[in-house]
Swiss-Prot record:
Gene expressing this chain: hutH
Protein name: Histidine ammonia-lyase
A molecular-function term among this protein's GO annotations: histidine ammonia-lyase activity
Organism of this sequence: Streptomyces griseus
Alphabetized UniProt keyword annotations: Cytoplasm, Histidine metabolism, Lyase
UniProt record, GO biological process: L-histidine catabolic process to glutamate and formamide; L-histidine catabolic process to glutamate and formate
Cited CDD domains: PAL-HAL
Enzyme class: lyase
Length: 514
C-alpha cells in the first residue's frame, strides 16, 4: 500500500486524495518529529512562566481573559475538546473525515502548533488503523476553523466519543483504540486547541471536489461534442484561430478537446436541406466558452488550495524565533470563496448540458431526430422523463449556487463576530458535484442514443463517438429501442461518467484530453 510521508512543509492534493479515498498509510518524517519536539520545548517554557499565553494558560474565545493555573491546564485542554464536540445531524462521509484528520496532522507536523510528537504519532496511528471518528454535518462556521468537526476527531484521540472501525461498524472510540493497540492521548498545554483550530474540513472537501470536477469538465467537453454531432452541428466554431483571439486558457482547452472527439465525423455540418443553419444554438456553439470559463475557475481554486495545503493554520502559532503569537489565519475566507465560486460554475455547466439534452429530444429543434428519441413516439415516451430528472437536478444546483460565504453570524459573545461559513460552502459543493455527474450522464445517454439513430440513417459518426457508444453499451446502458425501465440505464451512465470511463473510452482514439 502507498505510504504518504508527512513533513514540515505541507502536502499535495494528490496525497490528500490518496489518504482520504484510497486508504494510503501516513508516516511522520524525521524532520517533522524534530520540528514537533522543538516547538514543544517552546510551549513548555512559556507554560512555566507566570504571564498568561492564549491557548496555553488562558480560556478560549470570549473567555480568553481568564488565567488558568497549572493544576487546571490538562483539564482545560480536555474540556475544550469535549465542549466543542457539539456537532449535530447526519454523519459526514468517511473520506471527508479522513481528509480532515490528515490535513490536521499536516499542520501539526509543521512544528508551528506546539503539539508533542507522540500526539502526532497517535493521529497517524488512528488513520493507519482505518478508524474514522463520527463527525456530524452541522457545527462549523468556518472560522477558528472547523471547530466542531475537528473536536469530534480529537475526542477519538482521547478515547472518547464514537468512531467507525475499518469494518464499518460504529463503536466507542476507546474500544477501537484498544483493539488496535493505540493508547489514548493525555492532552497537555495548547494541544487541545491546536487539534481544533484549522480549515482542514473545508480544505479537504475542496481538494476532493477539484479532483471530481476535473473529470466532469473533461467529460462535459466530450458530451458537448457528442451532442453537437448528433444535432448535425458545425465544428468550424472549434477552430484554434477563433479561440486564439480570445485567449482564455480553459476555452482553448475545451475547444481542442471537442475537436479531437469530433475528428473524422461524417455528421458535423450535415445540415438539413430544407433548413440550412448558418449558426448553431448557443448551448452548442458556446460550449467551449462556458466549459472553458469553468476550467479557469478550477485552476484558480486549485491555486488557492495549493497555498492552503502549504499553510500552517493554528492560533496561536509557534514561530521559529521562539515567539508564540495570536493571529487570524484560521479564517476560512480564502477557501470559502472558491468553494462558492465552484458551485456557481458547476451549476452553469449543468444548465448548458441540460439545454443541449432538451434540444436533442425536441423534434422541432433536433433536425430530424424522432420526438424524445423514442422508438415509436406516442406509444413510447423515449427519454422524455430523463430530461425531467435532469431539469430537477439543475434546479437544485442553481439553489446550491447561492454563496454561503456571503453570510456571517457572530458567535462567542461577539468575540468571533465575522465568520466564513466555509464548511457550509463545502457541503453544498459536494451535493452540487454529485448532481453534476448525473446531469452529464443524462446528456451522454441522450447523445449516444441520438448518434446511433443517425448512424442507422447511414451517417458515419466520429471514431471517438463510436468508441463511447460501444463502451457505454458494454457498461450496461442500452441503446435505442422500445420503452423499458430507464433508471438502470441512467445509473449505468452515471457510474460510467463518475469513474472516468467516459474519458478513458475516447483517449485511445483522441490521445490524452486535458
Amino acid at each position: 500500500m502507498h505510504t504518504v510521508v508527512v513533513g514540515t512543509s505541507g502536502t499535495t492534493a494528490e496525497d490528500v486524495v490518496a489518504v482520504a479515498r484510497h486508504g494510503a498509510r501516513v508516516e511522520l518524517s524525521a524532520a517533522a518529529v524534530e520540528a514537533l519536539a522543538a516547538a514543544r520545548l517552546i510551549v513548555d517554557a512559556l507554560a512555566a512562566k507566570p504571564e498568561p499565553v492564549y491557548g496555553v494558560s488562558t480560556g478560549f474565545g470570549a473567555l480568553a481573559s481568564r488565567h488558568i493555573g497549572t493544576e487546571l491546564r490538562a483539564q482545560l485542554q480536555r474540556n475544550i475538546v469535549r465542549s466543542h464536540a457539539a456537532g449535530m445531524g447526519p454523519r459526514v462521509e468517511r473520506e471527508v473525515v479522513r481528509a480532515l484528520m490528515f490535513l490536521r496532522l499536516k499542520t501539526v507536523a509543521s512544528g508551528h502548533t506546539g503539539v508533542r510528537p507522540e500526539v502526532a504519532q497517535t493521529m497517524a496511528d488512528v488513520l493507519n488503523a482505518g478508524i474514522t471518528p463520527v463527525v456530524h454535518e452541522y457545527g462549523s462556521l468556518g472560522c477558528s476553523g472547523d471547530l466542531a468537526p475537528l473536536s469530534h476527531c480529537a475526542l477519538t484521540l482521547m478515547g472518547e466519543g464514537e468512531a467507525e472501525g475499518p469494518d464499518g461498524t460504529v463503536r466507542p472510540a476507546g474500544e477501537l483504540l484498544a483493539a488496535h493497540g493505540i493508547a489514548p492521548v493525555e492532552l497537555r498545554e495548547k494541544e487541545g486547541l491546536a487539534l481544533l483550530n484549522g480549515t482542514d474540513g473545508m480544505l479537504g472537501m475542496l481538494v476532493m471536489a477539484l479532483a471530481d470536477l476535473r473529470n466532469l469538465y473533461t467529460s462535459a467537453d466530450i458530451t458537448a461534442a457528442l451532442s453537437l454531432e448528433a444535432l448535425l452541428g458545425t465544428d468550424k466554431v472549434l477552430a484554434p484561430e477563433l479561440h486564439a483571439i480570445r485567449p482564455h486558457p480553459g476555452q482553448g482547452v475545451s475547444a481542442d478537446n471537442m475537436s479531437r472527439v469530433l475528428a473524422g465525423s461524417g455528421l458535423t455540418g450535415h445540415h438539413q436541406d430544407d433548413a440550412p443553419r448558418v449558426q448553431d444554438a448557443y448551448s452548442v456553439r458556446c460550449a467551449p466558452q462556458v466549459n472553458g470559463a469553468g476550467r479557469d475557475t478550477l485552476d484558480h481554486a486549485a491555486l488557492v488550495a495549493g497555498r492552503e495545503l502549504a499553510s500552517s493554520v493554528d492560533n496561536p502559532v509557534v514561530l521559529p524565533d521562539g515567539r508564540v503569537e495570536s493571529n487570524g489565519n484560521f479564517h476560512g475566507a480564502p477557501v470559502a470563496y472558491v468553494l462558492d465560486f465552484l458551485a456557481i460554475v458547476a451549476a452553469d455547466l449543468g444548465s448548458i448540458c441540460e439545454r443541449r439534452t432538451d434540444r436533442l429530444l425536441d423534434k422541432n429543434r433536433s433536425h430530424g431526430l424522432p420526438p424524445f428519441l423514442a422508438d415509436d413516439a406516442g406509444v413510447d415516451s423515449g427519454l422524455m422523463i430523463a430530461q425531467y430528472t435532469q431539469a430537477a437536478l439543475v434546479s437544485e444546483m442553481k439553489r446550491l449556487a447561492v454563496p454561503a460565504s456571503a453570510d456571517s453570524i457572530p458567535s462567542s459573545a461577539m468575540q468571533e463576530d465575522h465568520v466564513s461559513m466555509g464548511w457550509s460552502a463545502a457541503r453544498k459543493l459536494r451535493t452540487a458535484v454529485d448532481n453534476l455527474a448525473r446531469i452529464v450522464a443524462v446528456e451522454l445517454y441522450a447523445a449516444t442514443r441520438a448518434i446511433e439513430l443517425r448512424a442507422a440513417e447511414g451517417l458515419t459518426p466520429a471514431p471517438a463517438s463510436e468508441a463511447v457508444v460501444a463502451a457505454l453499451r458494454a457498461a450496461g446502458a442500452e441503446g435505442p429501442g422500445p420503452d423499458r425501465f430507464l433508471a438502470p440505464d441512467l445509473a449505468a451512465a452515471d457510474t460510467f461518467v463518475r469513474e472516468g470511463r467516459l474519458v478513458a473510452a475516447v483517449e485511445p482514439v483522441t490521445g490524452p484530453l486535458a
